[in-house]
Amino acid sequence: MLNQVVIVGRLVAKPIVEENENGRKVSEITLAVNRSYKNADGIYETDFIKCILWSCIAENTAEYCDKGDLISVKGRLQCLGGSELQVVAEKITFLSNNKNKEE
């Protein structure tokens, strides 16, 4: 069986690292991902995908990324119950940051 996804999108907020009850570092992020096709009104819709980052992946993403930055998340889908899913990140690639747009 294979459970692997790759998502490219923009961070909707600055990542924040917290420590869980076991002392592990964790960060929950949401990526805004534009669909590759237009809807009936001619508009590209956006999906908001929840991802969970652990340990050094969480710390590095929080240190080097900010709201609006484009990143790639490689990981696996995890069911949270019902129809709610999240991506458990195994690798993050920083593709671009929003700082260049401000200058």
Set out the residue ranges of the language-model regions.
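Single-stranded nucleic acid-binding surfaces, predominantly the OB-fold ssDNA-binding core
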Residues: 1-103
